[in-house]
């Protein structure tokens, strides 16, 4: 999977989230659903959380950190 594939998959899935959810909440829950605990690791270990923060810069940083963690985990295998 490339970074662009990752981004595309997230935003396609975000489009299917409940309309009542905030943008950051949609991104966080989508990544958690698709990729497991990487969202929680970024939230709790890296200190980047978009669940309650809908600013684009926070969401983009959260997505980038998730991608980095996923790539780092795959390199260790």
What are these regions (language model features)?
Residues 1-77:
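C-terminal alpha-helical interaction appendages
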């Amino acid at each position: 999977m490339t970074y662009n594939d990752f981004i595309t998959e997230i935003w396609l899935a975000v489009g299917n989230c409940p309309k009542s959810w905030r943008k950051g909440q949609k991104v966080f829950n989508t990544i958690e659903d698709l990729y497991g605990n990487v969202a929680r690791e970024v939230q709790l270990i890296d200190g980047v959380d978009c669940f309650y923060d809908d600013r684009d810069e926070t969401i983009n940083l959260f997505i980038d950190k998730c991608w980095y963690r996923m790539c780092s985990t795959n390199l260790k295998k």
